[in-house]
UniProtKB/Swiss-Prot annotation:
One of its GO terms (biological process) is intracellular signal transduction. InterPro entries: Ankyrin_rpt, Ankyrin_rpt-contain_sf, SOCS_box, SOCS_box-like_dom_sf. SUPFAM superfamilies: Ankyrin repeat, SOCS box-like. Coiled coil: none annotated. ANK repeats lie at residues 15-45, 57-87, 119-148, 151-180, 184-213, 218-247, 251-292, 293-322, 326-362. Keywords: ANK repeat, Repeat, Ubl conjugation pathway. The SOCS box domain mediates the interaction with the Elongin BC complex, an adapter module in different E3 ubiquitin-protein ligase complexes. This is Ankyrin repeat and SOCS box protein 18. Pathway: Protein modification; protein ubiquitination. May be a substrate-recognition component of a SCF-like ECS (Elongin-Cullin-SOCS-box protein) E3 ubiquitin-protein ligase complex which mediates the ubiquitination and subsequent proteasomal degradation of target proteins. It comes from Mus musculus. Belongs to the ankyrin SOCS box (ASB) family. The keyword Repeat applies. It holds the Pfam family Ank.
Length: 467
């Protein structure tokens, strides 16, 4: 019988658990340590911290007749509570807790959820989760099992999640399995997810953790986890211990692909991700590796409007014209997400692609781009200037919301002024030079004996109006 099926040594209703939960809730670490080190017996006792199991609470409002096949009860419920025999049941982890929702949310059918919430743990897991090194040492000296995981997570998992290097080291020194999988199929190394967990990761590897171990439903390796979170120092550590730079996860992603597809919110995260990708590329990562959807790292970087990362990938040979299974190019991905990206990032991304030889949008599709990116006129300007001559139609005005038009009136007036006028000679010269240089424009233009303003003009720097 598993620990999950066995009665816990200290059920939720026990006095010790009540005091322990109170101490945990208030952050009373001294009381927590006292309870788990001196009052809980045996040392590997199973403690129940949560249990919403309806079967143990007779007062719960659960229609047991539905589960037990009571026809009369079911008929009564149909008459009183819902009117649709196709009521939706959402089942998660086997729990059976009835949650009534308003008609406004789910209509007349309502929603029945069957959800199980139970948390089992041990004193050692609690001590490791809170970083109580002395408590962990005391429990281990009393022969606590370092691999016990009655709730699906062991003490080493908890230590790594909490970035507690000293606790992780103690557990490993006392025989904790560095590759022990939790209930989600993740090893401790997969749980080193923050910059502060670097020490835990190093301890795990020095104690024999498998650096190439796949884990979880996504079959990510530790290098994938580091890449997804922009942990460049973790990635360097893993590569030093033999991690394969182009290993693929269950979605066909390499670590580079995973890094480019992760959203970076702060400038620090952006910088770490850029360093990580540069590290992977120096280590031999394929800049154009495709995932199961045929998306390259460049597709993903463009989808997040990260011009610095796009430049890095293109310098390492990424294909600016690559198409995914849906027929979308990196440029298309950049345009699709332009209105959601931070200021200046979308047009910089589009500039980078066009200056590295990406084909522009098919002319007939330009009205659609205008409709999608109207709020970002800089993107429209950069893209429009990539054509030698694109006929402007007055009908395009319908694609621009009135408030957007008024907000960016100078630019859109200059756009529609070209409806019956050819582009200026300076623009035509720009297009001729760019056509001559092709995808080498970004390298050759800066070498021309021209003022910086003209070099920027040749590289499609937006000016705010068209001529």
């Amino acid at each position: 019988m598993s620990s999950w099926d066995s009665p816990p040594d200290y059920p939720l209703s026990s006095d010790i658990v009540r005091r322990l939960k109170s101490a945990l809730a208030t952050g009373d670490e001294d009381t927590v340590q006292k309870l788990i080190c001196t009052e809980v017996e045996p040392v590997d006792a199973v403690i129940e911290l949560a249990n919403d199991d309806w079967m143990k609470e007779p007062s719960a409002e659960l229609p047991t007749g539905v589960l037990l096949g009571d026809l009369d009860h079911i008929r009564l419920l149909m008459d009183q509570c819902f009117w649709d025999a196709n009521a939706v049941f959402e089942i998660s982890n086997g729990e059976m807790e009835w949650q009534v929702t308003s008609l406004a949310t789910f209509g007349l059918s309502g929603l029945w959820t069957l959800e199980y919430q139970r948390e089992l743990t041990t004193p050692l897991c609690i001590a490791a989760a809170h970083g109580h090194e002395s408590c962990v040492r005391h429990l281990l000296s009393r022969k606590a099992d370092p691999n016990a995981s009655p709730g699906g997570r062991g003490a080493l998992h908890e230590a790594c999640l909490g970035n507690h290097t000293a606790c992780a080291r103690l557990l490993l020194q006392h025989g904790a399995d560095p590759d022990l999988l939790n209930s989600e199929g993740l090893a401790p190394l997969h749980l080193c997810r923050t910059p502060a967990s670097l020490g835990c990761a190093r301890e795990l590897l020095e104690h024999g953790a498998t650096v190439q171990l796949e884990g979880g439903p996504g079959r990510d390796t530790p290098l994938h986890v580091a890449a997804q979170r922009g942990l460049d120092e973790h990635a360097q550590l893993y590569l030093g211990f033999g991690a394969r730079v182009d290993a693929r996860n269950g979605r066909g992603e390499t670590a580079l692909s995973a890094a480019c597809g992760a959203a970076a919110r702060s400038p620090d995260e952006h910088a770490r991700c850029l360093r990580l990708c540069a590290l992977l590329l120096r280590g031999g990562a394929a800049a154009d590796a495709r995932d199961e959807d045929e998306r390259s790292p460049l597709h993903k970087a463009c989808g997040h409007a990260r011009p610095g990362l796009c430049t890095l990938l293109l310098r390492h040979g990424a294909d600016a014209g690559a198409l995914d299974y849906g027929g979308a190019s990196p440029l298309a991905r950049a345009l699709q997400t332009a209105t959601c990206a931070p200021p200046t990032a979308p047009q910089r991304t589009v500039q980078v692609l066009l200056n590295h030889g990406s084909r522009s949008v098919w002319p007939d599709a330009f009205p659609k781009v205008l409709r999608t990116c109207a709020q970002v006129p800089e993107v429209i300007e950069v893209l429009f200037n990539s054509y030698t001559q694109l006929p402007v139609s007055e009908s395009w005005r319908e694609a621009i919301p009135e408030e957007v038009y008024q907000m960016h009136k100078p630019f859109y007036r200059s756009l529609f002024a070209l409806a019956h006028t050819p582009r200026c000679l300076q623009h035509l010269c720009r297009c001729t030079i760019r056509k001559l240089f092709g995808k080498e424009s970004v390298h050759l233009v800066p070498q021309l004996p021209l003022p910086e303003t003209l070099q920027n003009y040749l590289l499609l720097e937006p000016e705010g109006v068209l001529c």
